């Protein structure tokens, strides 16, 4: 909400002090670009912190390995493995 109010305030200032429509358009464009770059910087900081968390050593590695198994590809072989193990 603060960003919207700041944007509207800057737009109002631009309209009251601008010499022409082109000046207003250019000033608004610059403000929008600046806000977008600031948001992207914030998001990249969040993503970098998430990457650090993902690279940390985690417990339950075996559990995560089981989750990654493609069960649809493995499921047809389960009865064969059970029969083979049961024969011994």
From Swiss-Prot:
One of its GO terms (cellular component) is extracellular region. The modification Valine amide is found at residue 85. It comes from the Eukaryota. Residues 19-57 form a propeptide. Expressed in entodermal epithelium along the body column. Keywords: Amidation, Antibiotic, Antimicrobial, Immunity, Innate immunity, Membrane, Secreted, Signal, Target cell membrane, Target membrane. It is found in: Secreted; Target cell membrane. Residues 1-18 form the signal peptide. Belongs to the arminin family. Antimicrobial peptide with a broad-spectrum antimicrobial activity. Keeps its antibacterial activity under a wide range of salt concentrations that mimic physiological conditions of human blood, which is surprising, since Hydra is an obligate freshwater animal with nearly no salt tolerance. Does not affect red blood cells. This is Arminin 1b. It comes from Hydra vulgaris.
């Amino acid at each position: 909400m603060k960003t919207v109010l700041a944007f509207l305030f800057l737009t109002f200032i631009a309209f009251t002090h601008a010499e022409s429509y082109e000046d207003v358009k250019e000033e608004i464009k610059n403000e929008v670009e600046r806000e977008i770059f600031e948001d992207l910087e914030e998001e990249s900081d969040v993503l970098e912190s998430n990457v650090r968390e993902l690279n940390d050593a985690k417990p339950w590695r075996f559990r995560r390995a089981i989750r990654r198994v493609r069960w649809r590809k493995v499921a047809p072989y389960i009865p064969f493995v059970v029969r083979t193990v049961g024969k011994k």
